[in-house]
A protein has these predicted regions:
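Extended polybasic, low-complexity segments that bind anionic RNA or targeting/receptor surfaces
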Residues: 22-143
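Glycine/serine-rich anion-binding loops at beta->alpha junctions
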Residues: 1-21
Length: 143
């Protein structure tokens, strides 16, 4: 009768059976070349610099973490959120001051991404983080 060839009744050819070629897990990660990634970061930073939405912050003014002081700095500057704050790893007071503000993203230069720079309407970089940001966006490879 051919019944033995069919296998189980849960095989794809039977009603109520499985799916022959179901959708599987798929990774949508895309590899971007290092030079292209750096060029994109340079372009995004240049855009902020040209539009006047890039500010350099003196981290020394934050002796202790103060969200109130951080909010005052942003209000004094007068730029709309969202804001990206790039601070050096050692500037813990700045990181703690800005991290609790709404629509403010705080990151370190080693984790700076093009998407975050493009997302932000304003960019604040501390003096300690500025050389590291320049190095990350530079044309030459960094060690």
């Amino acid at each position: 009768t051919g019944r033995a060839r069919q296998g189980t009744i849960r095989a794809p050819q039977f009603t109520g059976g499985g799916v022959a070629f179901p959708p599987g897990m798929r990774s949508f990660d895309v590899k971007v070349n290092r030079k292209a990634r750096r060029a994109a970061l340079r372009g995004a930073l240049s855009h902020h610099a040209a539009n006047g939405t890039l500010a350099v912050l003196d981290a020394g003014s934050f002796e202790s973490p103060s969200t109130k002081q951080a909010k005052g700095v942003l209000e004094e500057w007068g730029k709309d959120a969202p804001v990206l704050v790039v601070a050096h790893e050692d500037e813990e007071a700045v990181v703690r001051s800005f991290r609790n503000l709404e629509r403010v993203l705080v990151t370190v230069p080693a984790e700076l991404e093009v998407a975050a720079v493009v997302w932000a309407r304003a960019l604040v970089v501390t003096e300690g983080a500025l050389p590291l940001v320049e190095q990350r966006a530079g044309k030459e490879a960094s060690a």
